[in-house]
Structures are given as structure tokens and as C-alpha cells.
Amino acid sequence: MSKKGGYKRTGVDVRYGDESVARFINAVMLDGKKDVATKIVYDAFAIIGEKMTEETPLEVYHRAMSNIAPVVEVRSKRVGGATYQIPMEVKPSRRGALAFRWLKQYATKRGGRSMAEKLAAELMDAAGEQGASVKKRDEVHRMADANKAFAHFRF
């Protein structure tokens, strides 16, 4: 048994009551500045609420996350002196973590405006099956599909 107290789960978000939003705020956070990350995410949700009146920002967020999250990915495995890219199913926790990482990465790369505006734009694009983060998911799926022949090497 661990002496360090174990893993502390992230609680639910204060404003939306959603654990996924709380984890996303933690993913956006830089240098431990959680207040700044919270303001960025809430401002992005407010922008989404203004621009997309037919849906709540939380619905747009969840749709975007399901569109970004990869189902399969490739993992390297060395077999007999050769390294193969083996397609494997992604665990749900990693699926969410990859979606958070890609969303933050490609929102940051967008030009100009504030981070909240860039994040809102990337979330709205991802909810509509567009945007760089959805392209990244498609690229990962294409790699897994191209290496389907090596699926029998699974770990």
C-alpha cells in the first residue's frame, strides 16, 4: 500500500457541475495558475453561448470532445529487430487526455486574439467536425488503419 496517500480525483466544476470541465481547466492551466485557466475556459464558454444560441456551451463542449477523442492509436513495439506500429484501442482516460491536449495545442496555434476567443473558436469548429484538432484525430485514425496488418502483434 502506498505511503503517499494515493490518487486524488479531480472534483466537479463549480459553475457547470461537470468533472470533465474541471479536468479541462486543469489541462489548460500553466504554471499552477488555476484562476487564469478557469477564467479562460469560462470566457470561452461565454463566447460560445453568445455565438451559438441554439445549444448550451456545455453541449457544444461535450460534442467537441467526442469529435476530437481518438478511438484507436498506434503504439510502437519491437519484434525481432524490427519496430512495428501496432494499432491499439485507446483507454477512456487517455482518450480524454489526448482530446484536452490537442484542443489546447491547436487553440494556442490559432492567430491573434485572446486565448478564450481562440479556445471558443476551436471548440465550435470541433463541434462541427472541423478544425485542426479534428484533423489530428483523423490523422491518428488513418495511421492506425494503415497499420492494421500488424494488429496481431498486440501487447
From Swiss-Prot:
Organism: Chlorobium phaeovibrioides (strain DSM 265 / 1930)
Keyword Ribonucleoprotein: yes
Single Gene Ontology MF annotation: structural constituent of ribosome
Biological function: One of the primary rRNA binding proteins, it binds directly to 16S rRNA where it nucleates assembly of the head domain of the 30S subunit. Is located at the subunit interface close to the decoding center, probably blocks exit of the E-site tRNA.
HAMAP family the UniProt entry points to: Ribosomal_uS7_B
Assembly and oligomerization: Part of the 30S ribosomal subunit. Contacts proteins S9 and S11.
Family of the protein in this entry: Belongs to the universal ribosomal protein uS7 family.
Keyword Manganese: no
Name of the featured protein: Small ribosomal subunit protein uS7
InterPro entries linked: Ribosomal_uS7 (IPR000235), Ribosomal_uS7_bac/org-type (IPR005717), Ribosomal_uS7_dom (IPR023798), Ribosomal_uS7_dom_sf (IPR036823)
GO cellular component terms given for this protein: small ribosomal subunit
GO biological process, one term: translation
Gene3D superfamilies, per database record: Ribosomal protein S7 domain (1.10.455.10)
Key words, A-Z: Ribonucleoprotein, Ribosomal protein, RNA-binding, rRNA-binding, tRNA-binding
